[in-house]
Curated annotation (Swiss-Prot):
Main location: endoplasmic reticulum
EC number: 3.1.3.56, 3.1.3.86, 3.1.3.36
Species name: Mus musculus
Localization: Endoplasmic reticulum; Cytoplasm
Origin organism lineage: Eukaryota, Metazoa, Chordata, Craniata, Vertebrata
Region described as Required for ruffle localization: spans on this chain: 340-468
Name of the protein in question: Inositol polyphosphate 5-phosphatase K
Amino acid sequence: MQHGDRNTPGYREGIMSAVSLRRPSAPKGFALSVHVVTWNVASAAPTVDLSDLLQLNNQDLNLDIYIIGLQEMNFGIISLLSDAAFEDPWSSLFMDMLSPLNFVKISQVRMQGLLLLVFAKYQHLPYIQIISTKSTPTGLYGYWGNKGGVNVCLKLYGYYVSIINCHLPPHMYNNDQRLEHFDRILESLTFEGYDVPNILDHDLILWFGDMNFRIEDFGLLFVQESITRKYYKELWEKDQLFIAKKNDQLLREFQEGPLLFPPTYKFDRHSNNYDTSEKKRKPAWTDRILWRLKRQPSQASPLASSVPTSYFLLTLKNYVSHMAYSISDHKPVTGTFDLELNPLMSVPLITMMPEHLWTMENDMLISYTSTPEFLSSSWDWIGLYKVGMRHINDYVAYVWVGDNQVSYGNNPNQVYINISAIPDTEDQFLLCYYSNNLHSVVGISQPFKIPIRSFLREDTLYEPEPQI
């Protein structure tokens, strides 16, 4: 992964890599829609409507997962102290906007100004396991986190996915340092104790952030004129990342959509004008979204028919900047993907079976079954949530599985929640089983209501269970 020798033979990539070369012959399962956001917010507060950024106004788009990376969040001492006790304002805003749409924040990692958030619709939670969250500081010789990367590694329906949000060194002359930090972040991400410890063997790496690559050779006036005329191709060919990929095999494995939008840096704040200060920095595509798919075998492996056939294909649908957002000197960039996969995990480890009808007047009896391979822990717990929960700790009540068990060892297992913990409301609820060993939700119920018995009629006691 070293970038020292840049004279090795290479070839020039086209606008889009031929994804079809990675397509195996295995049958397709289903598709997930993934929306990736990267934005250097330059210490700005979240005072704007983010509906367009999150594609909330696109009625034709049915998203399953949001992956959001911010750089240069305010990381002063006061901010760090307040974030230790409360959610930071940006995370709170994203949860405010996404939780009513049934997206749950499943992971968050922050290193000073870097923030990485992952949201998923709640029905996917039992099929997503958080493997680890890591931070790699590269500022001040690796001891300061103003530059570097933050990572979430997870298993998605049985596939390994690594997500990296980074902020690389600035300035035209620091290109070699940027590539060195790229390597350093990648080399720091190892996952000992798992069956795929090397990140390069993961099925997907999503890498994005303020990479700070600049446009070489051309002067300021030429770049500005090319942007005005939308002659982006000439500028793209002088982009430092584009040039580096020609001569580096590993970088070539990372794909990117075509840069058909204006350079995203540097703007005067609260405008769409490029830098008019004395420095007059040359515009550049500093904010990027890359991905790398592990090559899959072209034919199905001759394994037992009971073993699911691997199929995992990521297709970019849209790669754009959002010029309307002007609180920062960077414009945000988003990429929307279709992820087709044949699930390697199709049955949740825990299947929740709530009682047919609960009321506010009785303890809540919860039945569940587990798969043979599931290893429970005395620290496992079951949470009761309102539909629209923000994150896994946003429960209204919970019980330790070991403490409140009624029956164990013969499926179904049963636990109860005391009536005093049940909220007096007619909202819809969910039950989630949280595994301490896997640090993830491994079972979730369908939504249900808890009616007040005094308002029930006798003929309602045998109504069908509520549906999603």
